[in-house]
Regions:
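Mid-domain, small-residue-enriched loop/turn segments at the edges of structured enzyme/sensor domains
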Residues: 142, 159-164, 174, 180, ...
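Active-site-proximal loop and beta-strand segments within enzyme catalytic domains
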Residues: 19, 44, 56-177, 216-219
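Cleavable N-terminal signal peptides
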Residues: 8-10
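Short, mixed-charge aromatic SLiMs
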Residues: 106-114, 186-197, 269-276
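Hydrophobic/aromatic-lined pockets within catalytic cores
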Residues: 89-90, 151, 170-174, 186-194, ...
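Carbohydrate-binding/catalytic loop surfaces
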Residues: 121-131, 202-228, 232-234, 282-284, ...
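Catalytic loop of the DD-peptidase/beta-lactamase superfamily, centered on the K-T-G motif
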Residues: 12-53, 102, 176, 180-184, ...
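Bacterial N-terminal signal peptides
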Residues: 1-6
Length: 348
């Protein structure tokens, strides 16, 4: 167990004056929420505008959090994996119309989920009273629809377990291993280094060596947690730093990975009051601005926020080795503005 030091131990560079208040906010957020290691990067106009590193990246309080510190980025893997899958489809390596039932275990997974108490399986309501539809196991489901979280019907329902079957469906239809797809279509062209696509990635570089171990606060003390053993799926599994995620972000916006027209479709898509989910991104409108974002949550182990404001060419990426960044987002409503970190960033 590790006691959180009383003082905030920020290891940030000299942020531009305009980001100084946000820098201070993150330092206070870390201390108030007992987060050992927290890293953040802001991208603006295709360049790194600011970086902040706070706390310690080990369990002895001896290794300061730095640009090298890596985290399990949880579900912020999804937009990265989805982008790679889109690029692979454009290159003719797979069809977006392939059936999810090309995964021989998908039918059994759907049957189990639809009868489970899990809301995105058997249905229910979110905390606002919005309907969460049950999975429709009789409905033919394509890879394209799964990338849009349509396993439960016409409207999106965030269903990470079904999404995690994507790589199996691609392989079952004769496609390449997802790790190879993401490495070739995203990581390499974006210039990402020290990125482990799951624990077993032979090309992960120093990602595992620089990993900040997970913690969970219990009665005012930080208790080190067992690392999850899940490998790499389209839903989660990447281990990297915010700085390397920023390289993905810059390449994504510049059209290096997929054509700009596909990005414009996300920005210009008509969405309802609950927002939408398309190609690995939550879509949300806030004060006249289209937001593309994703959250990440490893229960009692880590959390993440990846938020884009395309109209301002602005991006925020935050990773932490506790679940403090997570805010229990609805399964059927995009509401990143409910996140204290996102709200402060958007209001700056």
């Amino acid at each position: 167990m590790l006691l959180l030091p009383a003082a905030t131990l920020a290891q940030a560079g000299d942020p531009a004056d305009e980001f100084a208040p946000f820098d201070q906010f993150l330092a206070e957020f870390r201390e108030e929420n007992s987060v050992p290691a927290l890293s953040a990067v802001i991208v603006r106009d295709g360049q790194i505008a600011w970086e902040g590193y706070y706390g310690w990246a080990d369990d002895e309080g001896e290794v300061a959090t730095s640009a090298d510190t890596t985290y399990k980025i949880a579900s912020t893997t999804k937009p990265i994996a989805a982008t790679a899958i889109m690029a692979e489809a454009l290159a003719g390596g797979l069809s977006l119309d392939l059936p999810m039932r090309a995964d021989e275990g998908f039918a059994d997974t759907c049957e189990w989920l639809s009868q489970s108490p899990i809301p995105f399986g058997s249905g229910g309501e979110d905390r606002h009273g919005n309907t969460v539809s049950a999975m429709d196991c009789a409905k033919p489901l394509t890879l394209s629809q799964m990338l849009d979280m349509r396993a439960n019907g016409e409207a999106f329902v965030y269903n990470p377990i079904a999404y995690a079957r994507i790589d199996r469906a691609i392989s079952g239809a004769g496609g390449r291993d997802l790790r190879a797809i993401v490495r070739d279509r995203v990581a390499e062209p974006a210039g990402m280094r020290n990125v482990a696509l799951g624990w077993r990635d032979p090309e992960g570089g120093d990602a595992l060596r620089f990993l900040a171990p997970p913690f969970h606060p219990v009665d005012g003390r930080l208790v080190k947690q067992v690392l999850p053993d899940d490998d790499f799926r389209a839903a989660a599994g990447i281990i990297t730093s915010p700085l390397q995620m920023a390289k993905f972000d810059i390449a994504f916006d510049s059209g290096v990975l997929i054509p700009p027209a596909l990005i414009r479709e996300l920005v210009e898509a008509e969405i309802g009051p609950l927002g939408d989910y398309r190609r690995g991104w939550f879509l949300e409108d806030w004060n006249g601005q289209r937001l593309l974002w994703h959250s990440g949550w490893n229960e009692q182990r880590g959390s993440a926020l990846y938020l884009k404001v395309p109209g301002k060419r602005l991006t925020l990426i935050v990773l932490a080795n506790t679940e403090a960044v997570w805010w229990d987002n609805s399964l059927v409503k995009a509401e990143v503005a409910e996140s204290p970190l996102a709200r402060r960033f958007l209001e700056e």
